[in-house]
Amino acid sequence: ANGERIAAKSCVLAAGGFESNREWLREAWGQNERGEWPADNFLIRGTAYNKGVLLKHLLEDHGADRIGDPTQAHMVAIDARAPLYDGGICTRIDCVSLGVVVNRNGERFYDEGEDFWPKRYAIWGRLVAQQPGQIGYSIIDSKAIGRFMPPVFPGVKADTLTELAQKLGLPVDTFTRTLDAYNAACRVGTFDHTTLDDCHTEGVAPAKTHWARPIDTGPFYGYALKPGVTFTYLGLHTDDTAAVRFNNQPSPNLFVAGEMMAGNVLGKGYTAGVGMSIGTAFGRIAGTQAAQAALKQKQAPALIHKAQTATNTGANHASA
C-alpha cells in the first residue's frame, strides 16, 4: 500500500506455464519445412491467462536455472471445433486407439494402438502438430461406439467411407486406399480394449500394434483433430527441496511447485494424473520448505545475488 514494498521471508512460486502465451509458443515452435507456423493452429484447453509472465521474469531477468524443452507440453488431440480457450476435457477425442487417424492428405502417420490410451493420449496433440495444417482426423466405425468417453460434439456421420471422406473434405481416392490397406492388414485375434490384445496389423506402415480391427461396419464417424495444449514443460530447475536454483545453487527461501517446475519430472510424453501429482507433491514440499525457511529468520534476508527482485515479485504475486 502507498508504494511500500513488503519483503517476504520466503516465497513459493506456483504461477503455471506459458501455454496461453501464443507469441512464446510461436517463438518456441518456429516455422516448419512447409513454411507453416504450427503454434498458430494450437488450441488452449484451459485459461487464456497462463502466459508465463513470472516464469519469463525469473528466467530472463534474474537468471534462474531452466529445465525442459519449450516445445514439449501436455498436448492432446482435441476436437477441431473446440474454442480457442477453456474447451476443457469434454473436447478431448478418446477414440483414437479404436480406429485410425489420417492427416489432411488421407494418410495414416502413427501407430494408433501403441499402448494403453492413458499412456499415449497426451502425445497425440504433438503428432497432429507435425502434420500438414496441424490437423488430423480420427476415423471409427459403429463397433467403437460405447467404448470411449463421448466428446461434447458429435462426430461427422456417414453410411460409407467414401461419403465420410467427402464430408470431412479429404481426398477420396487416397483416403479409400489408406482404409483398404489398413483393413486388409488387420489380423484380428481376441479383441479386448482393456488389455494389450493380439489384434494387430501386418504388412502396412505404420503398423497398428493392438486393437486393430477392420473399419467396415457402418455407420462411420470422423472427428477433425487439432493440437490442444494443457500445460508446458519448460520450467525452473529445482531439486527434491523444491528450491529454485541460480547458477546451480539452491535459493534459501525461494521455492517452486506445479507447472512452473514440471520439466524436472516430465521430459516428453505423459501418463494420466502426473500433472496433478507434481502439483500435489511439490506443493507440499515447497510449502513445508518455505515455512521452515521463514521460521529460521527474524527478518527477511537478501536472497542470493540476482534473486532479490524475483523474491519480491513472487511474494507480491503470491499475496495478490
Protein language model regions, located:
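Short acidic/polar mixed-charge low-complexity motifs
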Residues: 2-4, 107
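Active-site-proximal substrate-binding core of FAD-dependent oxidoreductases
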Residues: 66-80, 288-320
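Internal hydrophobic alpha-helix adjacent to the cofactor/substrate pocket in enzyme cavities
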Residues: 57-65, 176, 278-300
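Conserved mid-domain beta->alpha element of the FAD-binding
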Residues: 268-278
